[in-house]
Design a protein with these regions (language model features):
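Two-component histidine phosphotransfer core
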Residues: 1-123, 130-133
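C-terminal end segment of the histidine kinase catalytic
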Residues: 125-156
Length: 156
């Protein structure tokens, strides 16, 4: 379990590598509410979402693309969102996306760590691209999973 600030430090390092690969084709913007800095966040929660945005949204796009990462407090919850202006998907395929490895692993981790105290949504913003939003309890650490539990969950 990391604090949101440490998770973002890791994410910024990952983004720097991707920006070196994509050069001028990739812009990533962070809009982080300072009130969320001490919120506990599971390790590597956002990286797979940003990776999906870059790989499946921006990568196939012919021109430059943008990814936005936001964190803000909504009531008693921390709302994290990764949104891109990439190629997006048809409405009929939206539910299929949640069964991809990155999104399904993230959804499973959230269910294991927070039970019904989380929300995970994938939407198509009106301006295009894709958005993934996560809401988790702001001041309540997630249930820690042992390595054996995580391995068993991955095998299921």
């Amino acid at each position: 379990m990391l604090f949101r600030s440490a998770e973002l430090d890791f994410l910024r390092q990952y983004v720097a590598i991707e920006q070196a690969r994509f050069e001028d084709r990739l812009t990533v913007q962070f809009a982080i509410d300072p009130d969320t800095e001490d919120a506990p966040v599971p390790n590597f929660l956002l990286q797979p979402l940003v990776e999906n945005s870059i790989r499946h949204g921006i990568g196939p796009r012919p021109g430059p693309g943008h990814v936005w990462v936001t964190a803000r407090r909504v009531g008693d919850s921390l709302r994290l969102e990764v949104r891109d202006d990439g190629v997006g998907v048809d409405a009929g395929r939206l539910s299929d996306l949640e069964h991809g490895v990155g999104l399904s692993n993230t959804r499973s981790r959230l269910a294991h760590l927070y039970g019904d105290r989380h929300r995970f949504t994938v939407t198509r913003p009106p301006e295009g691209g894709l958005a993934v939003a996560i809401e988790i309890p702001m001041d309540e650490p997630a249930r820690e999973a042992s390595d054996a539990e995580l391995l068993a969950e991955g095998a299921a």
